[in-house]
Amino acid sequence: MEKKTHVACGNLISLSVIKPTTIPGLLITIGASTLGSLLPDVDLKDSTTDKLFDRLMTSLITIVIMSVLIKYLFNINIYTKIKEYNNIFNYLISITIFIIMSYLGSKTSHRSFTHSILGLFIYTAVLSYSFNNNIVLPYFISHLAHILLDILNKKGIALFYPFKFRLSLKLCESDGTVNKLLFTLLSILTIIVLIMISTNI
């Protein structure tokens, strides 16, 4: 499926399940849902998600190197100072591990680790370490929805990775007619759900 179809599906299901009652809650749900919808395709070479996590990994390495240099040159331990702020430290730990896992996921074959039950639960567990259900639940729902949608694809997914067996219902192609119809239907339903939610905000 195309990324816009995955996003539409993830947002529709997440919004329908969570039913946010505030503007910040709505934005958080959509943001976390969009991340969950797009993350599995980090393994698609040169995709937007792949390039994003390549840049994030480069930035992470740069920050680590700079921290070591600052410690060596000025005897300032940034790690220790950040650790004094326990909540911030825990968030940074989750984000750092998530970036590393996503970078490693980008180096696996398409529709393997990031499209598996194993990958789904590892990514969700990493987020759960620091973030609450306002973020974790829509992420989980959308990542799972992405996996289920790709099972419809003719090429299938390695749902039980690291086993190589690929599960496929062979009902459609990534950019075929079914994908276009699904995107249209999901988009219309998402708009309807958003209108219904907005009446309660």
Please state what every model-predicted region is.
Residues 1-201:
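N-terminal membrane-targeting hydrophobic helices
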